[in-house]
Amino acid sequence: MSIHLKGLKPGDLGEVTLIVGDPGRVELISSLFTNVESVVDTSREFVLYVGEYQGRRVSVCSTGIGVGSTEIAITELLENDAQMIIRCGGCGAWREGINPGDIILNSGMARSEGLLSAYVPAVYPAVPNPLLLSQIHNELTSNHKTVHVGIGLTSETYYFGQGRTPALNTRIETPNLIEYWEPRGIINCEMETAVLYLLGSLYNIPVANCLVVHVSRTNEKWTNDEDYRRLHRESAELVLNAALKFVNTNTQ
C-alpha cells in the first residue's frame, strides 16, 4: 500500500529506515550511502532514497512536520515491510543543563489524549525498543557525544501546544507547558516520535529516536544552521552504525 509514498513497494527499504521531518535532510543523510536511488521524489512532503551503507541496504524518508503526515509515512513504510525505523530529528530541550547541540534519546513519550486515539487508548505507552535505544546510546557516547535519555512530549501543535504565543487573540491565555511538564520529568518536546513508538509496538518492529537539540527553551539559545546540519549528518551516521550492530546481534 503506497498511496502517498508513490513508487514504494515491498523489498525496497532494506534493513534500516531512518525518518526525518525535513525533505532536504534526506539528501544530506543519503550522502552517507553508496548506490543511492530515489524511490519517492517530492510527493508532497515525502522524499525517499535507498542505498547501501557498509554494504547493507538502508533507506531514509522524510515525513513532514507533525502527527498527521508522520502517521501516513510510517504506516506506508510499515506496510511495505520496513524492518526497523529510527527517527533522526530535532527537538527543543525543556530541562536546564541540556544545551543546543546535545543529543536526546527518548525512553518514552507523553502525548495528548487525542493523539492516535483511533489506534490505542491514552493509557497505552509510547516507548521504543529498549535494546535498540541502548545500542544507539552506546554508539553515541563512545564517539564523545553529549547524550541525555528521558521522557519527552510529542505535541500536536508548534505554537500553543509548546507554550509559544502567536498573535492570535490576546484574550486567550497561553499555557505555561514547560512549567507544568518539566517537574513531571519531561526533558524535551517535539512533534513526531510518539507516532513512531506507538506504531512500532503495534507492528512489532524495533523503533527508536535520536534528536539533536536545536533550542534550549529555558534560555532560548539556538544551534546555528551550519552546526545543526553537521550534527544531523554525524548523528545519523552513528545511528546507522548502531542499527546495523543491533541487527547483527539480534539475528544470530
PLM ranges: what are they?
Residues 35-42, 144-151, 247-252:
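Flexible, glycine/charged-enriched surface loops at secondary-structure junctions
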Residues 126-185:
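Active-site rim beta-loop-alpha module in soluble metabolic enzymes
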Residues 1-135, 139:
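Metabolite-binding pocket within alpha/beta catalytic cores that recognizes anionic/polar moieties
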Residues 217-252:
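His/Asp/Glu-rich mid-to-C-terminal helical/loop segments that flank catalytic regions of hydrolases
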Residues 78-79, 182, 201:
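Non-catalytic positions within long, well-ordered alpha-helices that form the structural scaffold/packing
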Residues 18-19, 26, 66-70, 125, ...:
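Generic structural signal for well-ordered, non-membrane alpha-helical segments
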Residues 194-227:
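Zn-dependent metallopeptidase/amidohydrolase metal-coordination segment
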Residues 83-84, 187, 206:
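Short acidic/polar active-site loop segments enriched in Thr and Asp
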